[in-house]
C-alpha cells in the first residue's frame, strides 16, 4: 500500500497517528512508522528538505521512506526475493493526502487544519484523469513555491464551484484550506489542536458538513470503488488492487462497485480451477468389461465404440455419431444406464437367515444338503460331524458321482464359481495309501495329479474304498443291544471318544 501524507512536525505525531487511525482506515503499523519518522526530525520541515529513510520492520522486511518537506512516501518491501518478484505486477495504489495551511510557519502553529482525499495512483506515474490529481507527487520540489503550486492544483478541484478567484486568493496569501473554514466548509474537513491541560492529547473536530465519508470518497474518486470497503466500519485497510486490463472503458463502467469485480474474479478463478478436474475426469473414463473375453473392449478402440451397457450385459459396439460419444440409439445415455422397466432384485440375506446359517453345523451331506443340527457348545460342528470339514463327504464319492456333482453345479445359473474349473477344476482320481481319495487337482488334459500320474484307476477298488470309507466314517463299535455305534471317530483315529482303543467285537 502506498500512502502520501503532508503534515508538520510541531504536532504530537504519535497521538495524531492514533487519532487518525481511529477516525480513518489506516493500519497501526504503518501509522506508527510515520509517527516515528516524523518525531525523529525535530527541525521544521520545508519543501526543500528531503531525506531517504530506511529501517527494518518487525516482520523481517525492509521499509524505505522518502521524506520531502513533510511529504512522506513510504513502501514496504517483502523479505524474500521470490515474493518480491510475485508482487512486481502492475497495481493501483491508494494516494492519501493531508493538507496543512502553507501560509503559516510550521513551528509556530499549534493547530493544523487538514483534509484527507483518496484517489488511485499508478506506478507508471499516471494518475486519475480528474483535474485535482494531474500532478505526480513524486516530482522533485525545489522550493516552497512549487509545493504551494502542488497544493493549489488540489485546491482547484475542491472549490471548483467558487474557483473564479482562486489564483488571486493565492497571490494575496490567503489560506487555501483555512479560507474554507468559515465560508462553505466542505465535507471531511478536520482540525487537530493541542489540549493545553493535557499536553499529550490531540483534539479532533469535524468542521465540514455532516455527510458520510463514504459518499464523499465516492464523489472525489470515481475510478476506484473503494466505498464498499467502508460498509463494515472505518477501520478497514485499503489493499492494492490489480490494474484493470481494459484501459478504454468509460467513466460509468469504472464506477462499478468492487463487489462485482470480486464476483467476476472469483468466477474466473473457479472456472480455471475446475478445468484440470474436468480434464482428469475425461482421462479416467470408465470402460465396460464383461466376463466373456470376446466382449472386452480394447482401449485403442474405446473411442470408436458407443460403449453403453445393453440389457444382456454386453456393450454397444456401434460407431458413435461424429462429434459425440454415443450412437444415435443411445444418444445422451451413460455407460451404466439401465432401463427403468428392468428391475434386478438385490438378493441380500436377512439378519435372520445369517443367524440361522451361523448356528448350524454346515457340513455338506452326500445328498448335497447342509447339516442343520446345532453345533456343540464352543465348536463349529455337531456331535455327529465333530472334526469334519464342510466338504468332507464330497471326497468320499467315486469319481463318476463327483464329476456329475461338479457338472450339476456348473449348470445351475444361480451359483457363481470364482475359479475356472473347465479342465483344471477336476480332482485327482487316484487313491492314497490310507484308502482316501487324493485331494490334489489334476492338471489340464490329465486325470491324475503329478504324484499319481503313473498309477491306473481300479473302479473295483474304488468301490471297495467307498464301502470301506463309508464304514470308517462312523465308529462301528458293536454295542450290547446289537446295534452299531454311529458316532464319528476322533480325528486321526478309528473310534469315537467313548470307545477309544476298543475293537469292534470286544
From Swiss-Prot:
GO CC annotation: cytoplasm; nucleus
Top-level division of the source organism's lineage: Eukaryota
Residues of the GIY-YIG domain: 185-225
Ranges of Polar residues composition bias in the record: 234-247, 414-423
Tissue specificity annotation: Expressed in rosette leaves, stipules, stems, flowers, siliques and mature seeds. Expressed in the vascular bundles of xylem in shoot parenchyma cells. Expressed in the remnant cytoplasm of differentiated fiber cells and in protoxylem element of parenchymal cells.
Keyword Repeat: yes
Any single GO BP term: regulation of DNA-templated transcription
MF (Gene Ontology): DNA binding
UniProt keywords, alphabetically: Cytoplasm, DNA-binding, Nucleus, Repeat, Transcription, Transcription regulation
Residues spanning the membrane: none
Compartment(s) where it occurs, according to its Swiss-Prot or TrEMBL record: Cytoplasm; Nucleus
Keyword flag Cytoplasm: yes
Residue ranges with Low complexity bias: 273-288
Region (Disordered): 234-298, 404-426
Renumbered ranges of Cx9Cx9RCx2HK repeats: 306-331, 361-386, 428-453, 475-500
Compositional bias segments (type: Basic and acidic residues): 248-272, 404-413
Function: Transcriptional regulator involved in the regulation of cell differentiation in meristems. Binds DNA without sequence preference.
Free-text comment about domains: Contains a bacterial GIY-YIG-like domain.
Protein name, as recorded: Protein EFFECTOR OF TRANSCRIPTION 1
Top-level taxonomy: Eukaryota, Viridiplantae, Streptophyta, Embryophyta, Tracheophyta
